[in-house]
Structures are given as structure tokens and as C-alpha cells.
Design a protein with these regions (language model features):
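Helix-loop junctions at membrane interfaces in 12-TM secondary transporters
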Residues: 99-110
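Residue-level signature of mid-helix packing/kink "hotspots" within the transmembrane helices
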Residues: 61-69, 152-153
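Structural signature of the two symmetry-related core transmembrane helices
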Residues: 82-96
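Intracellular juxtamembrane helix-capping segments at the cytosolic ends
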Residues: 39, 119-132
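Symmetry-related core transmembrane helices of the 12-TM Major Facilitator Superfamily/SLC fold
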Residues: 170-183
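Helix-to-loop junctions at the C-terminal end of transmembrane segments
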Residues: 67-79, 163
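Helix-loop boundary and gating motifs at the non-cytosolic
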Residues: 6-61
Length: 183
């Protein structure tokens, strides 16, 4: 066999399977599920009123929209794996900023988390289109939903509960999930 004499470092890595992408979808759901409830509480606490909180979310949304539209262009200049890694890094930066708890840091954390979500979403879906054949796309989405169901069900409740125990706790947990998502 021809591959018998090829050193291990030269062998091609295995193609990712549907379950591998579903695991990534579950980890992303864990990060976002905890943040979807804890982040509004943190923003409201530091800004003090609903109007300022709404303005902060509007600005984060505008920035994330522009950023998300630029991700495909950016992946032409840098490899997609580095764009994906930068998205995970933005999640970690957002968690670190949210833990500090100042007005500016929590507002910047909101923007970083929105940019991270846009980046990882675009890169993740591009990877799925690259590695999952057309016949398995329906199965891929179904398996992703199964892996993401529990984090999306438990995460918001867990985020609020942890926030009431200790304000930085949901961000630490989301940071741990973001590190696992990066790995």
C-alpha cells in the first residue's frame, strides 16, 4: 500500500463528520445560552436605565451587522481558521471585559460578543458547506439542533441564577465554554 511508507506527519487528517460540527454547535449554544440572559442584566446594572441599555444593544447590533458583512471579505485575506479563532478570541475578550464590570467595559463586552457571534456564525456555516455533502445537510442541521437543545434550554436560566449568586460567574462559565469552543 502506498500510504504505508508515508510518515505520520504527512498523512491527511480525517474529514470532519456531522457529529463534530454538532458538538461545535452545542458549545456555541452553551456560550450564547448563558450570555443571552446574563448580558442584559449586566448592561442594565451598569447603565442604570432601559433607554441606555436599548441604545447599547442597538449600537452593538449595528457594529455586529457591519462586522458580519465584512467576515467573508476578511476570509479572502486571512485563512478562515484564523478568522474563526479570532471570533473565539473576541468571545474571550468580551468575557474578560464583562467581568471587570465598569460602564465602558460592559458596553465593549457587548460589542465584542456580538462581533464574536457574527464571526463564528459565518465561519461555522462556511465550514459546514465545505465539509458536509449536500445529501447530509438536513441530517447535519437536525443533529446540531439536538446538541444545542439543552444549552439553549438550560443556559438562560443558569445565566440568571449565576448572575444573582455572583455577577462575574456567568461570564466565567461562558468563557470556559468559549475556550472549549476554541479547542
Amino acid at each position: 500500500m502506498a500510504t504505508r511508507y508515508i510518515p505520520l506527519s504527512l498523512k491527511h487528517t480525517a474529514t470532519p463528520q456531522v457529529e463534530n460540527f454538532a458538538l461545535l454547535a452545542g458549545l456555541e449554544a452553551a456560550v450564547r445560552g448563558v450570555l443571552v440572559s446574563a448580558m442584559p442584566l449586566a448592561v442594565y446594572e451598569v447603565l442604570g436605565d432601559a433607554q441606555s441599555t436599548s441604545a447599547a444593544y442597538f449600537m452593538a447590533g449595528v457594529v455586529a451587522l457591519g462586522w458580519g458583512l465584512m467576515v467573508p471579505w476578511a476570509t479572502r485575506l486571512i485563512p478562515r481558521r484564523w478568522a474563526y479563532t479570532s471570533g473565539c478570541g473576541l468571545y474571550l475578550l468580551g468575557m474578560a471585559l464583562a467581568i471587570t464590570g465598569t460602564t465602558w467595559s460592559v458596553s465593549l463586552a457587548l460589542i465584542c460578543n456580538a462581533m464574536a457571534t457574527a464571526t463564528t456564525f459565518v465561519c461555522f456555516n462556511a465550514y459546514i458547506l465545505d465539509y458536509v455533502d449536500r445529501a447530509n445537510l438536513g441530517r447535519s442541521q437536525s443533529v446540531q439542533m439536538v446538541y444545542a437543545a439543552t444549552p439553549w434550554s438550560v443556559g438562560p436560566m443558569l445565566g440568571v441564577w449565576l448572575h444573582h449568586l455572583w455577577a462575574p460567574a456567568p461570564f466565567l462559565l461562558a468563557g470556559i465554554f468559549a475556550l472549549a469552543y476554541y479547542s
